């Protein structure tokens, strides 16, 4: 497979060139809340709150403070156009956003400049980053279902996590329900997402994710399902992890 100039992949990388191409096509619409990334805009407030609260519990911060993440270094892997990077920067975190799509990073930088925000955006992969870099918080939100080797990917994530650091992962479970809702429903019936956005075979079950994390000396301390209510038109946390779910993991002592 040949690589376009809009994407990056190196030998040993877990990046899938086809996955990069999918999201590169959406780069111009990332910040349109009514565009093709509308589902991400709808779920984003819940993701932000979940991550913020987990970080504040871990690092003993007041979640109500406007600068509750001040002094903490955060890495957002697969950051897209910065939908998580910008609000966490506002909360005081020193954010590094990485994405293998050049057009996504260009869109992220442009939007940050318009908002007069200083965010360290890089068109790169976790494998290409300086292994000496360290972060208090590492995010892999809706990423593991798009990589070629989940275990190797999480190993690189764990390597840049500071001792006592926190990792947050969100992904999709793999079962008949997730196929019906996340593939058939979201991509073909409701058309929330472009067809082919996800491959059901790449979805990761909670048990699989737990094992991948443990193999890299990361233990899950919190987990929650994420469900959508069509009547309220909003996402909420739930004990139901059949489709979307998030986990918080810490290094084993």
Curated annotation (Swiss-Prot):
InterPro entries found in the cross-reference section: SAM-dependent_MTases_sf (IPR029063), UbiG_MeTrfase (IPR010233)
Positions with a binding annotation for S-adenosyl-L-methionine: 47, 78, 99, 141
The reaction(s) this protein catalyses: a 3-demethylubiquinol + S-adenosyl-L-methionine = a ubiquinol + S-adenosyl-L-homocysteine + H(+); a 3-(all-trans-polyprenyl)benzene-1,2-diol + S-adenosyl-L-methionine = a 2-methoxy-6-(all-trans-polyprenyl)phenol + S-adenosyl-L-homocysteine + H(+)
EC number: 2.1.1.222, 2.1.1.64
Pathway(s) where this gene product acts: Cofactor biosynthesis; ubiquinone biosynthesis
The organism's place on the tree of life at top rank: Bacteria
SUPFAM superfamilies: S-adenosyl-L-methionine-dependent methyltransferases (SSF53335)
Molecular function per GO: 2-polyprenyl-6-hydroxyphenol methylase activity; 3-demethylubiquinol 3-O-methyltransferase activity; polyprenyldihydroxybenzoate methyltransferase activity
Signal peptide as annotated in the record: none
Transmembrane segments: none
Family: Belongs to the methyltransferase superfamily. UbiG/COQ3 family.
HAMAP family listed in its UniProt record: UbiG
Protein name: Ubiquinone biosynthesis O-methyltransferase
Organism of provenance: Bradyrhizobium sp. (strain ORS 278)
Organism lineage: Bacteria, Pseudomonadati, Pseudomonadota, Alphaproteobacteria, Hyphomicrobiales
């Amino acid at each position: 497979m040949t690589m376009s100039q809009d994407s990056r992949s190196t030998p040993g990388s877990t990046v899938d060139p086809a996955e990069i191409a999918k999201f590169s096509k959406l780069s111009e619409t990332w910040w349109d809340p009514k565009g093709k990334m509308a589902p991400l805009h709808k779920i984003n407030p819940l993701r932000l709150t979940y991550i913020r609260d987990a970080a504040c519990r871990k690092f003993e911060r007041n979640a109500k403070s406007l600068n509750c993440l001040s002094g903490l270094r955060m890495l957002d892997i697969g950051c897209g156009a910065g939908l998580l990077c910008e609000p966490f920067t506002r909360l005081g975190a020193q954010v590094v956003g990485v994405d293998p799509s050049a057009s996504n990073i260009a869109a992220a930088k442009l939007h940050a400049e318009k908002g007069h925000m200083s965010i360290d955006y890089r068109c790169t992969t976790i494998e290409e980053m300086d292994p000496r870099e360290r972060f208090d918080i590492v995010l892999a939100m809706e990423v593991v279902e798009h990589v070629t080797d989940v275990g190797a990917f999480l190993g690189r994530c764990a390597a840049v996590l500071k001792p006592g650091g926190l990792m947050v992962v969100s992904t999709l479970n793999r079962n008949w329900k997730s196929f019906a809702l996340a593939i058939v429903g979201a991509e073909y019936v409701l058309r929330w997402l472009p067809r082919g956005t996800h491959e059901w075979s790449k979805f990761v079950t909670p048990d699989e994710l737990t094992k991948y994390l443990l193999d890299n000396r990361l233990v899950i301390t919190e987990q929650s399902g994420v469900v959508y209510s069509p009547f309220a038109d909003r996402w909420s946390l739930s004990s139901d992890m059949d489709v979307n779910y998030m986990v918080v993991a810490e290094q084993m002592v």
